[in-house]
Amino acid sequence: MTVADGERWNWEWNAKAGLLFLGVMAAASAILGVTVGAERLPPAWALNVGEDVVGIAVCALLYYGCLCEKQGADETTRLFMAMLLAEAIKLFLDAASWMLEGIPALHGLNTVTYVLFLCSIILLGYQFWRYIRAYLAMNDAFARRCDRVMRVMLAPALALCLANLFVPLGFYVDEQGVYYNTDGYLLSMI
């Protein structure tokens, strides 16, 4: 199934906007590094941030490859491109969390980035399920039931992540901007 000719302009515009978004995220990672002082990061943290930025670049490269598809985009390609955008967002939030770690004045922002990072993991898992289901053309009764379960469980999982903004269920960031797991961390990852 390809995008109809009348929809081609919207497809191209949306896809190009996504590529621009990926470029902005890579630039924002670099700007954040300069702003908060990436030189203060321990070497292992700096390596992690660098890997995140390279990961965003790889997402952009793969996204561009999908954009160059000459025959339009079928459902699996569109879902794959959505996963690339979600992964790039997750990588950006991870890089931001590492760069904000240990800055007391930004502990609230660090908490928000961690919460959004956890939410992005859940959303990425859901998008992966949708991609696999479309790729394998799983339309039988069992797949539909699994899809229903995934959709029903998505809201409570996101709610538990968002609850970390107010109650330290899985983690907390102290006043010094340092991240800590709570006893409920493993449970919050399920």
List the predicted regions and their residue ranges.
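Membrane-interfacial segments
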Residues: 70, 132-140
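Short, Lys/Arg-rich, polar N-terminal cytosolic tail immediately upstream
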Residues: 1-11
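Hydrophobic alpha-helical transmembrane segments of multi-pass membrane proteins
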Residues: 19-36, 47-71, 75-104, 113-130, ...
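Divalent-metal-activated hydrolytic enzyme cores
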Residues: 13-16
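Interfacial loop-to-transmembrane-helix boundary motif in multi-pass membrane proteins
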Residues: 138-154
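Alpha-helical transmembrane segments and their cytosolic membrane-interface
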Residues: 153-189
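Non-cytosolic membrane-interface motifs at loop->transmembrane helix junctions
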Residues: 43-48, 105-116, 174-186
